Amino acid sequence: MGYSMWILLLVLSFARFAWATGDLVRLYEWSPGNTLAPIILPVKSGETPEQAATRYMRELQRQPELMELFEGRTPDLALSGFKPLNENSRESRALLIANLPKDYGMNSQRVINFKKIFAQSRHSSFILPMNANLGLSLEETRDLFKQISEKFPFMVAMGGDDVEPTLYKKQNTHSRNTIPTRDQFEIQLIKSYVAQEKGFLLGVCRGSQISAVALGYQLMQDVPFHVGDKVSHGNDWHEIQVHKTKHNILGSLVPNADGKLLVNSLHHQAVIYKENGPLQLAAQGHDGVTEATEFKNGRGLLLQFHPELMNNQLGSKILWRIVQQKNVVMPSRCSKIFAL
């Protein structure tokens, strides 16, 4: 038997083993050559990666809301650069949830900055495409969510457009550029990820808001309308008051006795905090607006501001602290083995 034939049989045997484990989809890395990080592509049983990518693009074209966001053009991604997701590097992966067209290209500053910080902490970044379950059945979607929880110990919900108000049982009074199809997918993904309790979730701006909605919280649809303009929450900087929490993720970075940090601000909506939920209030603006919440179980941090765009020492420290907390709640496989 020739060497190339032996390799082919080995690959086919691995594929059969993957399906035998009961997975309805396999996760592939898709590196088409013009994205900042590999795209995570779910491949159904009986599909090749090329067929899965074609299916995703075809189904994307059938979504009017999403195509309007893409201005009528699907992302220009080559049907090449596929390989199965490595099963042996789980602890060092970070998954960024795409929600804007620029996340598919080379010019997304937030993806650039997240990737840089994560690389410094020896984490590889990956991009989950918008509505990654396009063309999947309900059961296949559930399997996709389960595998994301199992294979990505770090997930980032990034900034972007407003969340559809009907998803937190409110009428639209001040929300802009809402896309229910996209929001519903992200909410279901976040619900599943949090429920699995196998990873750490970082939510930034919109990511904080949609994560809070997934956890049963509501949003203030327009901060100036509801609380006035005492604090400028638009394109500006302002101080926040940091509160001590159970895990003190953000509080551990406060250098001053008064518990204040200077952060950037690029939003007009905010989470309406409530007691007795899964989140703990971690920071507020001087006008009382929620600026940060932490998961009571230590497995998440939701920030209204953008540490990845602060471009200063504090922004980097915040992201490093988040990676540190992720490592605290995610013991390595070696430690689990020796604990047996």
Task: Locate each region found by the language model.
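Active-site-proximal beta-strand elements of phosphoester/diester hydrolases
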Residues: L301-F305
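N-terminal beta1-alpha1 cap of cysteine-dependent amidohydrolase-like domains
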Residues: W19-L202, V213-M220, P224-N256, K260-L262, ...
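Cytosolic ligand/metal-binding cores
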Residues: Q209
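Catalytic nucleophile serine of serine hydrolases
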Residues: C205
